[in-house]
Amino acid sequence: MLTKKEQRLRRARQTRIRIAQQGVARLTVNRTNLHIYASVISGDGSKVLASASTAEADVRKSLGGSGKGGNAAAAQIIGKRIAEKAKAAGVEKVAFDRAGFAYHGRVKALADAAREAGLQF
């Protein structure tokens, strides 16, 4: 029987394979207890086109003195930033790669904010 982490990694691997077959850029999300990270990777997987995380100094300042990067409000900020950076890099349409994480909470907040900022997926 697979552990919870092994199941998540298996789902993530299967998703990456399906997205690679489509050949479109992918928006990847990784979350930890303290931070959330997002990056837009080219269709062939060879280049990172844009990235944003709550570990960046600018984002930490905008979160205030608390520096809490592991909540839904921080995920919304990252969603807006990654959409702006992706559009600046010329990417408007992506496939959403949630890395096996459930589409709930911080992952959903990031995705919704990116959609509102104009990224299509």
Swiss-Prot record:
GO terms for cellular component: cytosolic large ribosomal subunit. One of its GO terms (biological process) is translation. One of its GO terms (molecular function) is 5S rRNA binding. Keywords: Ribonucleoprotein, Ribosomal protein, RNA-binding, rRNA-binding. Coiled coil: none annotated. The keyword Hydrolase does not apply. PANTHER family: 39S RIBOSOMAL PROTEIN L18, MITOCHONDRIAL, LARGE RIBOSOMAL SUBUNIT PROTEIN UL18M. NCBIfam families: L18_bact. Belongs to the universal ribosomal protein uL18 family. Part of the 50S ribosomal subunit; part of the 5S rRNA/L5/L18/L25 subcomplex. Contacts the 5S and 23S rRNAs. This is one of the proteins that bind and probably mediate the attachment of the 5S RNA into the large ribosomal subunit, where it forms part of the central protuberance. This is Large ribosomal subunit protein uL18. The gene is rplR.
